[in-house]
Amino acid sequence: MRVYLVGGAVRDRLLNFPVKERDWVVVGGTSEALLSLGYQQVGKDFPVFLHPQTHEEYALARTERKSGLGYTGFTCYAAPDVTLEDDLQRRDLTVNAIAQTPTGELVDPYHGVDDLNNRILRHVSDAFSEDPLRVLRVARFAARFAHLGFTIASETQALMSNMAINGELSVLTPERVWKETEKALASPSPQVFFQVLRDCGALAVLFPEIDNLFGVPAPEKWHPEIDTGIHTLMVLKVATELTDEVDSRFAALCHDLGKGLTPPEQWPHHYGHGPAGVKLVDQLCQRLRVPNSARDLAKLAAQYHDLVHTVTQLRPKTLLKLFDAVDAWRKPQRIEQLIIISEADARGRTGFENTPYPQGDCLRQAFKVASQVQVKNIVDSGLRGADIGHELRRQRQHALAQWKQQDDTAQDNTVT
C-alpha cells in the first residue's frame, strides 16, 4: 500500500496557508487491510477510514462514474488497481488534484502547481459537469482566494454556464446550497462568490431575489454606481471589512432585496422597500433553510437600515421603538450588528467607500444611555405589574431627551 497526502492540505501548504486538516488517499490497499491495522471505516457510499491514532481520514483510491441525477448519483469503484492518477482525475480543480508523498515529493499529473503559480482555478476534466455542487465550490474558492489574484479559467467558466443553462443546479438540496454559501460568507471576499454565480447564470437559479437587483436603478445622487445589484455586492464587501460574523454579512447582502419589487415606473425611487424586503428575506431563508439567527437579523436589517441612517434626527420615543423592535434589551449585540450593516450600506457606494458614519456612534450612545436606566430601582420604588414597564419607558425616554439636549448644546457650542 502507498499513502499520499491529497487535496486542500497540499494546496494550502503550497500557498503558505495554515493546514487545518489533512486527507490521505491509499493506493493499492483494501478495506480488509486497513481494518486489520486498526482503522475504523466511516464512509457509507465509498471506503473512508479513520486512522487509529490521528483520526485523520484515509480513503481508498477510487473512480466515480455518473449513474444518476445530481451530486449523489455516482457509482464508486475502489480497488487495488485504481491508480493515484485515476483518483486525482475525479477531483474538481487542478489545484485540488495534487498529491504529496510521505517524503514531501509532489505528484501533479494535471498541472495543478502551474495553475497555483498562475493563480488559475481550472477543472481537471469534463467530468466536472457531472456534479452541480462544483459550481458552488468553484465560486467559493474564487471568493476564498480572490485576494491572492485567483481567477477562473475561461473553459471552466463555460462549463459552469452550461450547467446552469441545462438545469443541472435544480437538483441541489437547500442544505448543500446554504452550506457552501455559509462558507463563502466566511471567506475574505464573499462578494466574489455571488459575482461568479451571476456570471455563470447560477445566481438567477439559486438566489433569484439577489439576481433581480441587477439592472434596477437607484437615484444617481445617492448611488453613483446606480445599479442596485452592484451596490449590494459593494455593501457586502464593506461589511466583510467591518465584521467576521456570517450573520451580519448575510444581512448586509439582503438589506435591499425589496428594491427588486419596485415597479419600473417608480424607478429610480424605492419607497417602502424596507418592509417589502422583509417578505423576500423570509422567502429566501425558508427556501434555503437558513439558520434562524441569520434570518432574523437579515429581516431586521431590511426593515430598519434606512431608519438607522436618520438616527441623529430621531425623537427619544422613536429610538425606544427601534430598540424594542430589534429586541435590543435581550439581545444588545443587535445594535452593533445593525450599525455595521447600516455603515456598510452607506459606504457601499461609489465615491463613499471611506466616508465616516457618525450615525453609528450616535445609535451606540443612545442605547447606552437608555440601558443605564435600571429596572431594579423602579421595582424598589414600590411599583408593581404593568406600572413597572410604563415607568421604565418613561425614565428611558426622559434619559434620552436629556442626552439629546446635552448633545445638541455641545454641538451648538462648537459652532464659531
UniProtKB/Swiss-Prot annotation:
Protein's job: Catalyzes the addition and repair of the essential 3'-terminal CCA sequence in tRNAs without using a nucleic acid template. Adds these three nucleotides in the order of C, C, and A to the tRNA nucleotide-73, using CTP and ATP as substrates and producing inorganic pyrophosphate. tRNA 3'-terminal CCA addition is required both for tRNA processing and repair. Also involved in tRNA surveillance by mediating tandem CCA addition to generate a CCACCA at the 3' terminus of unstable tRNAs. While stable tRNAs receive only 3'-terminal CCA, unstable tRNAs are marked with CCACCA and rapidly degraded.
Binding site for Mg(2+): E21, D23
Co-factor note (free text): Magnesium is required for nucleotidyltransferase activity. Nickel for phosphatase activity.
Domain notes per entry: Comprises two domains: an N-terminal domain containing the nucleotidyltransferase activity and a C-terminal HD domain associated with both phosphodiesterase and phosphatase activities.
Alphabetically ordered keywords of this record: ATP-binding, Hydrolase, Magnesium, Metal-binding, Multifunctional enzyme, Nickel, Nucleotide-binding, Nucleotidyltransferase, RNA repair, RNA-binding, Transferase, tRNA processing
Organism superkingdom: Bacteria
Note: A single active site specifically recognizes both ATP and CTP and is responsible for their addition.
Source species taxonomy: Bacteria, Pseudomonadati, Pseudomonadota, Gammaproteobacteria, Enterobacterales
GO BP terms in the entry: RNA repair; tRNA 3'-terminal CCA addition
NAD found in the keyword field: no
GO function term, MF aspect, one: tRNA binding
Family annotation (CDD domains): HDc (cd00077)
Binding residue positions for ATP: G8, R11, R91, R137, R140
Record note on quaternary structure: Monomer. Can also form homodimers and oligomers.
Domain (HD) ranges: 228-329
Full protein name: Multifunctional CCA protein
The family this protein is said to belong to: Belongs to the tRNA nucleotidyltransferase/poly(A) polymerase family. Bacterial CCA-adding enzyme type 1 subfamily.
Signal peptide start and end residues: none
Reactions catalysed according to its record: a tRNA precursor + 2 CTP + ATP = a tRNA with a 3' CCA end + 3 diphosphate; a tRNA with a 3' CCA end + 2 CTP + ATP = a tRNA with a 3' CCACCA end + 3 diphosphate
